[in-house]
Amino acid sequence: MTQSTMLDEAIRHRLRAVLGPLRVVYGAMVGSILVYWIVVQVIRKVGQIPRGRDAFAAVDWLRYPLYALGLVACVVVLVLRRRLFDPEAVIRRAQGQNLPELLSTLSSNQVLVFAVGEVPVILGLALYFVGGYLLDFYILAGLSAVAFALAFPSAVEWEQVLIRVRTFRPELFAHPGSSG
């Protein structure tokens, strides 16, 4: 690799410092799917909520739009990642920012993507509470798992974006600091 395509060690260190906490947030949000599953299992055993399908029959048709919203959330994760991490868009948004501010912006954007990935499992939990359809919860939890897989914060992807930004905004990388 040439000097222009490689990120120096100080920038990689700073990138790791940003990605570490992001991955903790990612793990916690993915872990929330398990927490919701435990809640559903406990409620099933206790038998208090939901009241049953007969009470939900009048609005049973709502299941399908909520499934569609779960699928839309997966698509939104893909679109958001592409738009928020598009190198040209990052370069435009980097106007007037230094490297730590840029990394903070990217980090905040990544958390937004995670939040969208959690939408399907929350919809599934709501459907289970209202109608008692366990399958609804499982399907929508599965969609959340897919959305989270699509949202994983890849160090390689972040490096590629920063290399591209460095090409057009080298002043951001002039003195990154040695300790991050």
Spans of features found by a protein language model:
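Short terminal or interdomain "cap/linker" segment that borders an active site or interface and mediates
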Residues: T2, V90-A94, A141-G180
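Membrane-helix interface/capping segments
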Residues: L78-P100
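Alpha-helical transmembrane segments and their membrane-interface junctions
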Residues: A115-D136
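Select subsegments of transmembrane alpha-helices in polytopic membrane proteins
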Residues: R23-G31, S107-E118
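Hydrophobic alpha-helical membrane-embedded segments
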Residues: Y67-R83, S144-F152
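Short membrane-interface loop/juxtamembrane segments of multi-pass integral membrane proteins
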Residues: R92-V116
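Interaction-prone helical segments in low-complexity regions
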Residues: M1-A73, I91, Q95, P170, ...
